[in-house]
Amino acid sequence: MAEMKSPTKAEPASPAEAPQGDRRSLLEHSREFLDFFWDIAKPDQETRLRATEKLLEYLRTRPSDSEMKYALKRLITGLGVGREAARPCYSLALAQLLQSFEDIQLCDILGQIQEKYNLQAMNKAMMRPTLFANLFGVLALFQSGRLVKDKEALMKCVRLLKILSHHYNHLQGQPVKALVDILSEVPESMFQEILPKVLKGDMKVILSSPKYLELFLLARQRVPAELESLVGSVDLFSEDNIPSLVNILKVAANSVKKEQKLPDVALNLLRLALQENKFERFWKEVLEEGLLKKPSYTSSYMCFRLLGASLPLLSDEQLQLVMRGDLIRHFGEHMVVSKSQNPLRFIPEISAYVGTFLEGCQDDPKRQFTVMVAFTAITNQGLPVMPTFWRVTRFLNTEALQNYVTWLRDMFLQPDLDSLVDFSTANQKRVQVASLNVPERTVFRLRKWIIHRLVSLVDHLHLEKDEAVVEQIARFCLFHAFFKTKKATPQIPETKQHFSFPLEDGNRGVIVSAFFSLLQTLSVKFRQTPDLAENGKPWTYRLVQLADMLLKHNRNVANVTPLTAQQRQAWDQMMSTLKELEAQSSETRAIAFQHLLLLVGLHLFKSPAESCDVLGDIQTCIKKSMEQNLRRSRSRAKASQEPVWVEVMVEILLSLLAQPSNLMRQVVRSVFGHVCSHLTPRGLQLILAVLNPETNEDEEDNVVVTDTDEKQLKHGEDADSDSEDSKNSESDVDSEDGEESEEEDRDKDVDPGFRQQLMEVLQAGNALGGEEEEEEELGDEAMMALDQNLASLFAEQKMRIQARHEEKNKLQKEKQLRRDFQIRALDLIEVLVTKQPEHPLILELLEPLLNIIQRSMRSRGSTKQEQDLLHKTARIFMHHLCRARHYCHEVEPGAEALHAQVERLVQQAGNQADASVALYYFNASLYLLRVLKGNTTKRYQDGQKLEGADIKSEPKDSEVQTTSCLDLDFVTRVYSASLESLLTKRNSPLTIPMFLDLFSRYPVICKNLLPIVVQHVAGSSRPRHQAQACLLLQKALSARELRVCFEDPEWEQLISQVLGKTTQTLQTLGEAQSKGEHQRELSILELLNTVFRIVNHEKLSVDLTAFLGMLQGKQQKLQQNLQQGNHSSGSSRLYDLYWQAMNLLGVQRPKSEKKNVKDIPSDSQSPISTKRKKKGFLPETKKRKKLKSEGTTSEKKAASQQDAVTEGAMPAATGKDQPPSTGKKRRKRVKANTPSQVNGVTVAKSPAPNNPTLSPSTPPAKTPKVQKKKEKLSQVNGSTPVSPVEPESKKHQKALSTKEVKRRSSQSALPKKRARLSLVSRSPSLLQSGIRKRRVARRRVQTP
């Protein structure tokens, strides 16, 4: 331990002679020093580094040889600890220590390591730790950065690593790898000297291990002349060495299986092949014909990683060789076969390699373009294997991106199938289908992928830099989605583009869906500002202008779906309306209308018949909206005439919401946010009709939820892109599921009609055989006829089951679409509540939203869409509606209806089966109260400046009624009925927090409801309801807002009523038998404590003497229940509440009594204690009997009597004025109940600690004064103190004999004495010697 001591302190001769402060500081320094080594071995890297830094700082600031030696010893020992994860931590710490203290010799450290972990003396059990300790020791010396400068230590480490390399079973190739790392940094002269010692001249040895080959490649790179003199001229890529290289690469691939990285030897071989111009032989013969001849997944992944790592090293010709060989086809097959959930999928790694390559050659667009085209050309029957959304495209520079987009466009128009590296999987080759091998299918799959890749490119573009590319892609998609060329013209470049394969309808549908996806990307990613886009126009507007220009060139361009005259007229009117809106472009509402028009106008080309009518209605609504905006200054004389255009607009927006388009959903939200201020009741009912389940079920056909062709196309794309393996597996699973569902349907609903038909067929078969030959077998003709009839019957039944199953799936799908449409329709409700919280129509949303919540809560275990609908509705209702800062103020005409709605909501809350649903209804009623009350609550809160009785009282009830629409009497009756329901019904959905929220918001209502609560505190109510009433009353009385509503006499009268009710319940305190009764006792004491605090704080003239006597009479019962373990989970809480009440009445809980409550042993013969014994305790019969002390001297008796007088004469004192402990608690506890005699005079015993009382002169509600210390000393010296008055029920305790008290005191003192002896036995020798001397002296005195 001398090494662990701080060098700043002189080493003490012994612990006894060291001062206390010096010994403490020495221990602290030692503990701090030792903690460093514990933290170094922890798995958290930050903790290890922090501990290492602190250790180095500690050693720098306290330079001491002993601590340095100990640190080195601990770190060297840690190199071979049993926990393998800690060995590298100690190695790194040792390296940093050697790096910081360069005066430490490396040879000495290496010698200590070899001495601690001797390779010659190790046994079998210590072999692995010894080997790793030597290896990590060498690594520590190398990581310190000083090994290459110390030749002697370097040679020793090389020899040690050479010895360790023979233990391959434990260390694998780590020693040779460490040797390669060391030699890669040594000077060339030293390398030449070490090389003959570590590398033999035999090529068989070199080609036997990846590490030896890596050492050979390192020597060939650094000292080729010395290597040639040692090995000779070697052609590593000769025909003879190719098999050995293949085997070495296989071993290297298996060695990095867990690390999932490229072996260094493979990359070094690639560099050597490039250097010697033998790359083609290496790639074809070693990789493609060697490793991939019978590939394993480790060899395949090594080849894939080598492909990615070789990209920056290859020339254009070599890139063409690599990207069109067998390896790239094997890579493509892996991409197709591996699933997205497969952890071995290689797409993240190849993306990292390609991204690094593209980022590194930003100034070479040709190489970027070549690599992108090469990876795009890897196709499986025409479908490229790379994902359409590939993040590496963001590294393309402008020229490479433009060339790549041009190549994609040309491949879409005139596919060059010969330039593709196409392949088929094993299953595709096995299952040869003639329809799948035609060029048309290959072109269809290729074009579908290309159009999605073009759209995905826009996500990675910067508009400022690549605006031309974005416009080129958008024009291409728009033209080929909706138009076709009649005659080429130079004004439209797209007309010069010709297809080598005709564009099929399937491809055109893909282009249409991709075009609207592109609109979504452009609207979200590129939100135009005037300084970014041409003339500050959004992309949608520019595309509409392009479409208008194409429509005008009808000689050169034709629509794919021709427009009628009416549809063309609707388009022209839209363009004129856009010009009108353009003049008002500064208004946000005009911008929203413009965006809606543009989007619906583009949908005119997709579905002309549907969009034409919608387009006309939108224009009509926009014009009427603008006209009403101009006439806004007029009077509201025509306010009763509802603006029909708003209702039409709502219908339009609802129909647009039915389309599964996120872009359309955003536009609808934006437009509705600008028109919702003009919303009418009829318009709101149109929205609520979608959300209302009753009308929605009956009118399902009113709003058609479209399941667009986008999903079907996506499904077809997935079906085409999947491999045959997935097809087969999915078909098997589907067939199994179909069989199981059919069996379930057959078992679940047996058709009686089918059973009757089956019986008729069987009877007809029997009749065909003849009535007289019933017991004989049927003939062949009869059997054939019976089989045919049965087969047709079962076929019909199977068709009926299949039809029912399809009908069930159809209904389920329709239900999902309907729920999804309702979720979208909630967007309009959310916009209305957020944008117009003061709109009168907001009040009509309460009950419809509550109906949705109630219905969804009833079916909460259903689909995810039901859950989403519930969560969104609840969020809108609670956060945006009930908790909104603003609300409607114009409710005077409908105040009576609102009061009726409050009553209805409160009654519905009380009738719910679920408390969570009742909470929503109750909060809705509170929201209506807030609306009815208006701004009066805010005015009262502004006047609340003071506390207690000095606060100005709130205005009277009549004032409240005159300043707001709230009918206080009516509301009081409503909530009093619900409060009665809470405090009387057995299972009420109403809860205490609901009424606490009501009381805190509306204290005037709370004042009117308090008599009901006080009435249920006692009486014939259930104990649980009484406990709820006490809790509600306690929280209400503590509220500051309630006190403002009471005058001082009213408040004092209320407190007296509460105390009178609690007196009835206190009669049974401590006699609880059930859980509800016990909860009532806890609640009544908490209420009493609150009332006592109010009385003391406000100094109310309330007499509490009766409560003092009543509580003192219950003390013994409560203490007995606590000792016996009755209701053990809450007895201590009840006892604490009791003493809190006594403390508020002026009686302090004695400290000694509080200790005795925990230390009193339970009686083993008690019937309650024998019911259930605690685990881990011996029974009474197995315990050793305690020895009784018999020889007690008179001196000991006198001392105990004097201590008893000291404690017994001491009155109750408050905690803050209590004198500090003198260290004699044990003797005071033992002798507390002993009658004291001083000089032969018996001193009157003070009240027992269990029964503290007040003197007659002390006021009942005030704490008695604390006696001073000198008075206590005078009592000890012989003066007789004045004994306070004790209750009659407690005087029987004075009849206890002195003998019994002595016996109990001696028995209770024995365990504590033994505990103290055990503590002494663990104390230092100095303390033990002093205690031993005092113990011997005491024995001598006690011996007669």
Swiss-Prot record:
N6-acetyllysine carried by residues: 69, 156
UniProt modified residues of type Citrulline: 1322
Pfam families named in the record: DNA_pol_phi
Molecular function as annotated in GO: E-box binding; sequence-specific DNA binding; transcription corepressor activity
Keywords from the UniProt entry: Acetylation, Activator, Biological rhythms, Citrullination, Cytoplasm, Isopeptide bond, Nucleus, Phosphoprotein, Repressor, Ribosome biogenesis, Transcription, Transcription regulation, Ubl conjugation
N-acetylalanine modified-residue sites: 2
Region (Required for nuclear and nucleolar localization): 1154-1344
Keyword Transcription: yes
Record note on modification: Citrullinated by PADI4.
Organism: Rattus norvegicus
GO annotation (BP), single: positive regulation of anoikis
Function: May activate or repress transcription via interactions with sequence specific DNA-binding proteins. Repression may be mediated at least in part by histone deacetylase activity (HDAC activity). Acts as a corepressor and in concert with CRY1, represses the transcription of the core circadian clock component PER2. Preferentially binds to dimethylated histone H3 'Lys-9' (H3K9me2) on the PER2 promoter. Has a role in rRNA biogenesis together with PWP1.
Annotated stretches, region: Disordered: 1-24, 696-752, 1150-1344
Residue segments, region Interaction with MYB: 2-580
Name of the protein described by the UniProt record: Myb-binding protein 1A
Chief subcellular location: nucleus
Compositional bias (Basic and acidic residues): 708-730, 1150-1161
Biased composition (Acidic residues): 731-746
Motif Nuclear export signal 2 boundaries: 261-279
Skewed-composition ranges (Basic residues): 1170-1187, 1301-1316, 1331-1344
Bias (Low complexity) ranges: 1247-1256, 1317-1329
